[in-house]
Amino acid sequence: MRYISRTVWVLSLVSLFTDMASEMLYPIMPIYLKTIGFSVALIGILEGIAEAVAGLSKGYFGKLSDNRGKRAPFVQLGYTFSALAKPMMALFVYPVWIFFARTLDRLGKGIRTGARDALLSDESTPQTKGRVFGLHRGMDTLGAVIGPLLALLFLYFYPGRYKVLFLVAFIPGLMAIFATLFIKDKPVKEQEAIDKIKTGSFFSFLKYWKTSPADYRKLVIGLLFFALFNSSDVFLLLKAKEAGLGDTAVIGVYIFYNLIFALFSFPLGILADKIGLKRIFIGGLLCFAAVYLGMSMSHHLYAIGALFFLYGVYAAATEGISKAWISNISDQKDTATAIGTYTGFQSLCTMLASVIMGFVWYRFGSTVTFVLTGSAAVLVAGYFIFLPTFARHE
């Protein structure tokens, strides 16, 4: 795989270790917070604030990375913050401290995302971006498979030792920090470094929307419209639980989904480079629609398992592909800003989608909620079908 550079492999390993640490804690986070006195409402506020911080900071730090002409420092600092936040959650149980630690974790994600994806873009060509972003997403998601399995194994031998698990999760976080030390920036030409010091306000990245290429805006409008209907995966797990699956089976289908996501990301990236990013992305949207429409009427373990398989294919066909697509139609000097602006808005839309889906579920039931979501995905797929192809390899 000559087109996969050393930097891409390092970034992929860093993401694997980081996601391993995060996903070790994901299944037990709500349980731990409730044991230290957090109400469901307070947990919701905590996650909402954390996601808002992550979303807004992605755009700002993406633009800052472009302005400074640097990628590595943002990647290193971002992953360090996220790693340090894990054991901090176990040190004290005061709500203010928990809010600080959780926000630090998401701030780390905001700092690194734009710069990391710009590095991936810099290390690829229009002909290889699908497979480069696909490999990275696959390794990242492999961590999401290993993490919960390690957590289940730990809690099997040490039930209820949640604080210790937070400390154990620091180990892969440390490995990620160490790996980031091998990431180096490419030299920036002197002419390209002119006026790089001006950074602007925290919301200055929003100005990029006005000056960005029209093709970028058309693409991102479609992506954000989809994000408004693409709520948290928690709702799929709740639907599986409602259909009669036990706790172990629910965790099992979640791990299965991540495994399929990891296995299919790189092959679909290769296929996207051959037949076009747009075609693979639309195929992913149709998989998403099939999953939500299918979940609205499925009540058997095997049917739900098949739908979670399809959900893993959807994720592999869209998550890395969308960033590769954006980087293909953005100027190289603005790549971090372009991706950071999109992922920032995407985080906010996803948060809003979860609120809307929760309300619709409460008011009209899960079946109506899933049918509406699946139908909306079909409409978004139609938008992309009629969207012009912007570049040779889309």
What are these model-predicted stretches?
Residues P73-P87, F170, R279-G294, G374:
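Structural signature of the two symmetry-related core transmembrane helices
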Residues I31, T35, I146-V164, L352-V368:
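Transmembrane alpha-helix termini and helix-breaking/packing motifs in multi-pass membrane transporters
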Residues M1-A54, D215-V253:
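Helix-loop boundary and gating motifs at the non-cytosolic
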Residues P172, A179-D195, I385-E394:
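Helix-loop junctions on the cytosolic side of multi-pass membrane transporters
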Residues K163-L181, T369-I385:
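Symmetry-related core transmembrane helices of the 12-TM Major Facilitator Superfamily/SLC fold
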Residues S57-G69, L155, S265-G276, W361-Y362:
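Helix-to-loop junctions at the C-terminal end of transmembrane segments
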Residues M1-S5, P187-I221:
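Juxtamembrane intracellular "pre-TM" segments in multi-pass secondary transporters
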Residues A101-L142:
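Cytoplasmic helix-loop-helix junction between adjacent transmembrane helices
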